[in-house]
Curated annotation (Swiss-Prot):
Catalytic activity: 2 (2R)-3-phosphoglycerate + 2 H(+) = D-ribulose 1,5-bisphosphate + CO2 + H2O; D-ribulose 1,5-bisphosphate + O2 = 2-phosphoglycolate + (2R)-3-phosphoglycerate + 2 H(+)
Name of the protein: Ribulose bisphosphate carboxylase large chain
Enzyme class: lyase
Keyword vocabulary terms for this entry: Calvin cycle, Carbon dioxide fixation, Chloroplast, Disulfide bond, Lyase, Magnesium, Metal-binding, Methylation, Monooxygenase, Oxidoreductase, Photorespiration, Photosynthesis, Plastid
Family membership: Belongs to the RuBisCO large chain family. Type I subfamily.
Miscellaneous field: The basic functional RuBisCO is composed of a large chain homodimer in a 'head-to-tail' conformation. In form I RuBisCO this homodimer is arranged in a barrel-like tetramer with the small subunits forming a tetrameric 'cap' on each end of the 'barrel'.
Binding of Mg(2+), residues: 192, 194-195
Binding annotation for substrate: 114, 164, 168, 286, 318, 370
Cofactor: Mg(2+)
Function: RuBisCO catalyzes two reactions: the carboxylation of D-ribulose 1,5-bisphosphate, the primary event in carbon dioxide fixation, as well as the oxidative fragmentation of the pentose substrate in the photorespiration process. Both reactions occur simultaneously and in competition at the same active site.
Amino acid sequence: SVGFKAGVKDYKLTYYTPDYETKDTDILAAFRVTPQPGVPPEEAGAAVAAESSTGTWTTVWTDGLTSLDRYKGRCYHIEPIAGEENQFIAYVAYPLDLFEEGSVTNMFTSIVGNVFGFKALRALRLEDLRIPPAYSKTFQGPPHGIQVERDKLNKYGRPLLGCTIKPKLGLSAKNYGRAVYECLRGGLDFTKDDENVNSQPFMRWRDRFLFCAEAIYKAQAETGEIKGHYLNATAGTCEEMIKRAVFARELGAPIIMHDYLTGGFTANTSLAHYCRDNGLLLHIHRAMHAVIDRQKNHGMHFRVLAKALRLSGGDHIHAGTVVGKLEGEREITLGFVDLLRDDFVEKDRSRGIFFTQDWVSLPGVLPVASGGIHVWHMPALTEIFGDDSVLQFGGGTLGHPWGNAPGAVANRVALEACVQARNEGRDLAREGNEIIRKASKWSPELAAACEVWKEIKFEFPAVDTL
């Protein structure tokens, strides 16, 4: 005999361990599992633990050369999901030694790798991850974080205002720079490259960077405020991306931008390191996230992508609006917004938070609310997101009937009115419309904006529910 029993495995025997006490150093995962008909939940949960850690489909004799108990993932708890037939939350604990230090790429390759194509499962979704301090301490994290950003910009006590330059594709560099200048001059803190703007035939990246830098300096000189434009450094290769970041630094730009999912975590982490070493803020766009996170029973929830970004590094990240044109249910959105900003977040299932997360000293990330929002949303946004956020109005600035600068003025006046009202103790949720109406009496720009967008709503039921 060869000393082991050949044949296909029953995963449950090795990988389902309901008595396991989780360690402080384990990475914990909560999976929403939909087994194929006839597959018991324990077997499905164990299969997930096995396939995302040390297991393979059959017994191999090299198993005897390692300590399986030390390295295997363990499914330690399974609970049915209320209101769903044949869906379960499977909790899996992974020993820390399974993962390379400082690599989101490696962590995801294991935890959300091949296991998602596993035949015994009809669908699989990663709902949440608990990152232990022992692992998060191996990452640099955000280049600067919320407090350092406020100090760099000298802006306190209010949300920051941004605007994505539209039309997103087709403008020449000079016209693009003009739009940037007008928005910043009108009172915004930031303007933004659209995520699709990289270096296309109608506008090469170097020309755009130059004209935008000119716009920033001109607006700063005229307003006495620090201004920024998110220069999108995303490129086809990591080398080209860094080349663009270097040029942005040479121009004295305060902030650059990256599409972290399409660009990839390896590229993003490299860029975040460059940004900290060179004093650049890093704005992160989440293009492609809905491919991964929008299906309720398969893929990965955005809160996991948000945690991964905080490890990989970024100072801002788009996080839904709750009120605009893009997906986001209020409590769930606030759950991952807190996971981005706060040092310590308690487990709270009503907000979709499955684990208590302690970030220790990893800097926080500013959530960005962007997509289909306008001046009438300002009270709600100020109330929902609070001061530590960036509110971005693309069409809600550039769609102003009098032009870009008046659009920016309208947003800035609306924001200042909301912050002042809140500081005076007024209830933004109830009195929001009244606050905006009153402010518009003193600002013709705001009055015009109020008139244009008074009836606009994007009312569809949210898909992202608990």
